[in-house]
Amino acid sequence: MSIRSSSPAQSRTSSLVQRHPLACFFVLTYLAAWCLWAPLVLLRGTLPAAVAFILVLLGGWVPSTVAIVLVAIMHGRRGVRRLLGRLVKWRVGLRWYAVVLILPLLVPLGLGLSILFGGPAPTVDSSIIAVLVGFVFSIFPGSAVGEELGWRGFALPHLQDSRSALAAALILGPIWGSWHFPLFMIGSESRPLILFPAFMLSAIALSVLLTWIYNSTAGSLLLVVLLHATANLPITVLLGPLAIDAVQPYWIFTALLIITAAVVVGFTGPANLSRTQRKQTSEDIRPVPNPVPAT
């Protein structure tokens, strides 16, 4: 007979994670990602493009990596399997796929209104194939999967344990948005620092919409990832080429996003941000206990 034992250090780590899962997640996610992105800020313009790309990519995967590690500590392999299983939860109703495709149209709508009021029009050189490749990349290995196992898969359910879905979304939004700050400090023409205030507000509004999708689909991370990716794509393709001139259309897009989020809150109510499902809590990401055999 063998007895599994853990070292005192492992026991202390497990106890800390069990008692403070959110604090552990946020601290580790910020610390690891910002350490990876620090060279981009400190050595901006001098790093080889390939190195910079890899650092951005690795940092983008930190939230999901941290979530998997914490779930493994808290719930073991079965917990990790349950978390990953939400990435393939696709039977949620066609209307939610339609929502995921329609919401990103706010970006070209915002750009169109900006042009109508005298703003510049972008020169889009991307072919359809390039756009499709960019979309697939933004899902995996891009930031959508790399982020959402953490932000919506781990942090959101824990935030919803003791507060309404709206409150959880409004807390998570600024934390999620601020986490991107170093990427606005690296001097990229497609992500100028002047856009950061609008980006923060759009992150908060998008956090509400992603929470709505997540709760309404009973925790489908697949739909969350798809919305994250489809929202990023038109911003990159349409607003990225404008560089500093993207300020006006980005603010208009942000205003439209806030209005949409407000309509969703009014329609669903703040408690669950869903008319048909309850909010997802940390209980929903724990593995189901094995049935006790009858004696």
Question: Which residues does each predicted region cover?
Answer:
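Membrane-helix interface linkers and caps
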Residues: 8-16, 36-99, 113-127, 213-219, ...
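Membrane-helix interface segments
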Residues: 18-23, 49-50, 79, 92-95, ...
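Alpha-helical transmembrane spans of integral membrane proteins, capturing the lipid-embedded, hydrophobic core
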Residues: 22, 26-30, 34, 57-64, ...
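Aromatic-anchored segments of alpha-helical transmembrane domains
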Residues: 30-38, 104-112, 142, 173-183, ...
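Juxtamembrane helix-entry segments on the extracytoplasmic side of multipass membrane proteins
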Residues: 122-137, 187-200, 251
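Membrane-interface helix/loop boundary segments of multi-pass membrane proteins
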Residues: 146-173, 215-220
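Alpha-helical transmembrane segments in multipass membrane proteins, preferentially the mid-helix core
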Residues: 204-216
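C-terminal membrane module of polytopic membrane proteins
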Residues: 217-295
